């Protein structure tokens, strides 16, 4: 057993996908959930491709349509506890573009209270109240 397998042994693995979505004005789609700025993402469903999962989650969490994947980005991992179980979430990220200019609709049942298009010059400010893996993901963008 290698170190990675040893590390993963005590966790329930959840695979998910999400998007760094940019509109025609090169603004980034961000969500506000649990008191932090984040990116739309969610769990992979059975027999769903990871790309379809990423697109579906952006649509569900933000109400954005007409999404096109540009490229796959780096994967991220984070751990948390849920119902006395240790969870390891593996997230596959995709850079996307959209021409959608309709209303943004936060998925309230998922705890999302805001969905915003964020100008490039305002991203750093939002990242002051975000997660380490999101900061790392956006470093090269």
Language model regions located:
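Acidic, metal-coordinating catalytic segment for phosphate/diphosphate chemistry
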Residues: 1-18
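Charged phosphate-binding loop/patch that engages nucleotide di/tri-phosphates or the phosphate backbone
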Residues: 129-141
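Unchanged
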Residues: 44-131
């Amino acid at each position: 057993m290698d170190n990675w397998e040893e590390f993963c042994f005590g966790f329930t693995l959840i695979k998910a996908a999400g998007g760094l979505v940019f509109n025609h004005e090169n603004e980034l789609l961000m969500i506000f959930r649990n008191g932090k700025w984040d990116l739309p993402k969610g769990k992979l469903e059975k027999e769903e491709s990871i790309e379809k999962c990423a697109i579906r989650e952006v649509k569900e969490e933000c109400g954005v349509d007409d999404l096109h994947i540009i490229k796959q980005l780096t994967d991220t991992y984070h751990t948390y506890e849920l119902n006395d179980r240790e969870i390891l979430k593996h997230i596959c990220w995709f850079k996307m573009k959209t021409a959608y200019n309709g209303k943004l609709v936060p998925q309230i049942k998922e705890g999302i209270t805001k969905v915003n298009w964020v100008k490039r010059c305002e991203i750093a400010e939002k990242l002051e109240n975000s997660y380490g893996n999101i900061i790392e993901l956006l470093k090269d963008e």
